[in-house]
């Protein structure tokens, strides 16, 4: 978007992904001039859809899988939006380097069962279909939901928790 006096404006709404932040940094380095007004909104899934539909953001970054694809496609179409695939992700378990399971090549769901599972809460639209995590439909004994990435990582370290995500950092 062109801003007042030639200042470039641009906004991206995204789920909580480091790769999106890194891409945003690259974007600013490539297109940032003397003046710009760029925004990166790490937010809940439904808010991302609303942001793009209402033109608050030019781009939204969402995770789709076999479980949520049909529902999310309907929601996107109802907002007159399109989904474009960036990449296909394989699940990775994120744990701290001091976690008892650290250093293992493969970790099973049974081995993770005793540890807290950390995920992002989705507010009033808190449904499995809006989840940011790859294996969200699985039932877990210990669940902690947070709103921001820093809190998730601090709890992951402090409680020997884990999350499952794309592995793209």
Walk through the language-model features, giving the residues of each.
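Alpha-helical "hinge/linker" immediately C-terminal to small N-terminal DNA-binding modules
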Residues: 1-7
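Flexible hinge/capping segments at coil-to-helix
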Residues: 4, 75-117
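Central regulatory/effector-binding core of bacterial HTH transcription factors
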Residues: 7-71
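Secondary-structure junction motif
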Residues: 20-23, 69, 109-138
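General small-molecule cofactor/ligand-binding pocket signal
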Residues: 37-41, 84, 143-145
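Beta->alpha turn/N-cap motifs
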Residues: 44-45, 61-68, 96-97, 148, ...
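Short hydrophobic/charged patches on amphipathic alpha-helices used for structural packing
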Residues: 49-53, 83, 109, 152-153
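Hydrophobic hinge/microswitch elements
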Residues: 53-56, 122-169
């Amino acid at each position: 978007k062109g801003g007042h006096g030639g200042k470039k404006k641009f906004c991206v709404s995204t789920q909580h992904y480091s790769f999106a932040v890194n891409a945003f940094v690259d974007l600013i380095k490539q297109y940032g001039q003397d003046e710009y007004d760029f925004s990166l909104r790490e937010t809940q899934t439904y808010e991302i859809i609303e942001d793009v539909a209402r033109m608050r953001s030019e781009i939204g970054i969402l995770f789709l899988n076999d479980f949520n694809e049909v529902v999310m496609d309907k929601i996107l179409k109802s907002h007159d939006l399109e989904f474009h695939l960036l990449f296909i992700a394989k699940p990775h378990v994120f744990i701290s380097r001091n976690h008892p399971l650290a250093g293992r090549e493969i970790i099973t769901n049974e081995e993770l069962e005793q540890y807290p599972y950390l995920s992002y809460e989705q507010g009033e639209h808190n449904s499995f279909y809006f989840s940011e995590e790859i294996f969200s439909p699985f039932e877990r004994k210990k669940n902690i939901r947070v709103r921001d990435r820093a809190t998730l990582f601090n709890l992951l370290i402090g409680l020997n928790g884990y999350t499952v995500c794309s592995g793209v950092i």
